[in-house]
Amino acid sequence: LKCNKLIPLAYKTCPAGKNLCYKMYMVSNKTVPVKRGCIDVCPKNSLVLKYECCNTDRCN
């Protein structure tokens, strides 16, 4: 699986066991992601942070 880094022009290949890509936003500003990468389990959203997870190459 290949996931985009913070700047989507760059990506990385995920290590074994991390089979989801994710994008994290501040709830107050959903237009600008603050973090992207590989993850094993999609975190729950909080009052401050929103996560979007997916499982295809460069989907984040």
UniProtKB/Swiss-Prot annotation:
Disulfide bonds join C3-C21, C14-C38, C42-C53, C54-C59. GO terms for molecular function: toxin activity. GO terms for biological process: killing of cells of another organism. Gene3D superfamilies: CD59 (2.10.60.10). PROSITE patterns: SNAKE_TOXIN. It comes from the Eukaryota. One of its GO terms (cellular component) is extracellular region. The keyword Disulfide bond applies. Expressed by the venom gland. Keywords: Cardiotoxin, Cytolysis, Disulfide bond, Membrane, Secreted, Target cell membrane, Target membrane, Toxin. Pfam families: Toxin_cobra-type. The keyword Secreted applies. Its main location: secreted. It is found in: Secreted; Target cell membrane. Shows cytolytic activity on many different cells by forming pore in lipid membranes. In vivo, increases heart rate or kills the animal by cardiac arrest. In addition, it binds to heparin with high affinity, interacts with Kv channel-interacting protein 1 (KCNIP1) in a calcium-independent manner, and binds to integrin alpha-V/beta-3 (ITGAV/ITGB3) with moderate affinity. Monomer in solution; Homodimer and oligomer in the presence of negatively charged lipids forming a pore with a size ranging between 20 and 30 Angstroms. Belongs to the three-finger toxin family. Short-chain subfamily. Type IA cytotoxin sub-subfamily. This is Cytotoxin 1. It comes from Naja naja (Indian cobra). The lineage of its organism: Eukaryota, Metazoa, Chordata, Craniata, Vertebrata.
